[in-house]
From Swiss-Prot:
This is Outer capsid glycoprotein VP7. Residues 1-50 form the signal peptide. Keywords: Calcium, Capsid protein, Disulfide bond, Glycoprotein, Host endoplasmic reticulum, Host-virus interaction, Metal-binding, Outer capsid protein, Signal, T=13 icosahedral capsid protein, Virion. Ca(2+) 2 binds at residues 177, 228-229, 231, 301. It holds the Pfam family VP7. Some rotavirus strains are neuraminidase-sensitive and require sialic acid to attach to the cell surface. Some rotavirus strains are integrin-dependent. Some rotavirus strains depend on ganglioside for their entry into the host cell. Hsp70 also seems to be involved in the entry of some strains. In group A rotaviruses, VP7 defines the G serotype. Calcium-binding protein that interacts with rotavirus cell receptors once the initial attachment by VP4 has been achieved. Rotavirus attachment and entry into the host cell probably involves multiple sequential contacts between the outer capsid proteins VP4 and VP7, and the cell receptors. Following entry into the host cell, low intracellular or intravesicular Ca(2+) concentration probably causes the calcium-stabilized VP7 trimers to dissociate from the virion. This step is probably necessary for the membrane-disrupting entry step and the release of VP4, which is locked onto the virion by VP7. Homotrimer; disulfide-linked. 2 Ca(2+) ions bound at each subunit interface in the trimer hold the trimer together. Interacts with the intermediate capsid protein VP6. Interacts with the outer capsid protein VP5*. The lineage of its organism: Viruses, Riboviria, Orthornavirae, Duplornaviricota, Resentoviricetes. One of its GO terms (cellular component) is viral outer capsid.
Length: 326
């Protein structure tokens, strides 16, 4: 009897000692794994950059909203800035190294010299025919001219907004505009646009469909024309197609990587009265200086404030691709 009890006690002690040894071994192994894992994290953490997955995904509205809690690089370290200016600016400055001077001044505002591009255009009229905005941020300087203020307004409306466009065959079809965002945009060396509104029987309203001389003329020998007619009414068009191309376009919304700076002028260009402009604020501003050096100095001084009003976009504007999307 006593032998059985001794055996039971001995078995219990051996089991307890064995279990205690196994638990201690497991504890040492876990400590080794955890400490080694923490050591690896500490060593590698300075070499890794934080990634915030999903934060920058668009929810609704603009695709260009930058959220405060996302990992963001400094704008000027990863972006390009194009500055568009008229030929008269370079002519007045008359200095072969003026661009290098401005690049060095932009550097004082945090923009590396390789990120600034200077783009010259002849005048507003020629720029309207072939606008090309390729940089992450684009600032267009437009010298005010009372004789060209309507051209300036149309150009501003074109480049400050995105448009979805399709070609129009005016020889075969009638066209109508469905809503206020629907416009007909014409570009070319000389665009003369005539329209004839039609009734439900496709007869001209105040005009003869067989006589273009009776059509209403809405533009004469212009480079850029944004035509707006009565919505929901079919129109027969007459366009100088030999020197002009017309497209059926839909305004999608603001092109947020473009800003227009008006140089001088007693009147301030304003396209926010257009009901299709939403929101009712545009990246348009005015600088009142007589000399171009003073204009460029002001742009350099306020470049970062100007950029804050804009959003970096991936799409560029190229009139050659206007048929699809600009």
């Amino acid at each position: 009897m006593y032998g059985i009890e001794y055996t039971t006690v001995l078995t219990f002690l051996i089991s307890f000692i064995l279990l205690n040894y196994i638990l201690k071994s497991l504890t040492r192994m876990m400590d080794f794994v955890i400490y080694r894992f923490l050591f690896v994290i500490v060593v590698l953490s300075p070499l890794l950059k934080a990634q915030n997955y999903g934060i920058n995904l668009p929810i609704t509205g603009s695709m260009d909203t930058a959220y405060a809690n996302s990992t963001q690089e400094e704008t000027f370290l990863t972006s390009t800035l194009c500055l568009y200016y008229p030929t008269e600016a370079a002519t007045e400055i008359n200095d072969n190294s003026w661009k290098d001077t401005l690049s060095q001044l932009f550097l004082t505002k945090g923009w590396p010299t390789g990120s600034i591009y200077f783009r010259e255009y002849t005048d507003i009229v020629s720029f309207s025919v072939d606008p090309q905005l390729y940089c992450d941020y684009n600032v267009v300087l437009m010298k005010y001219d009372a004789a060209l203020q309507l051209d300036m307004s149309e150009l501003a409306d074109l480049i400050l907004n995105e448009w979805l466009c399709n070609p129009m065959d005016i020889t075969l079809y009638y066209y109508q505009q469905t809503d206020e965002a629907n416009k007909w945009i014409s570009m070319g060396s000389s665009c003369t646009i005539k329209v004839c509104p039609l009734n439900t029987q496709t007869l001209g309203i105040g005009c003869l469909t067989t006589d273009t001389a009776t059509f209403e003329e809405v533009a004469t020998a212009e480079k850029l024309v944004i035509t707006d007619v009565v919505d929901g009414v079919n129109h027969k068009l007459d366009v100088t197609t030999a020197t002009c191309t017309i497209r059926n376009c839909k305004k999608l919304g603001p092109r947020e990587n473009v800003a227009v700076i008006q140089v001088g002028g007693s009147d301030v260009l304003d396209i926010t009265a257009d009901p299709t402009t939403a929101p009712q604020t545009e990246r348009m501003m005015r600088i009142n200086w007589k000399k171009w050096w003073q204009v460029f100095y002001t742009v350099v001084d306020y470049v970062n404030q100007i950029i804050q009003l804009m959003s970096k976009r991936s799409r560029s504007l190229n009139s050659a691709a206007f048929y699809y999307r600009v």
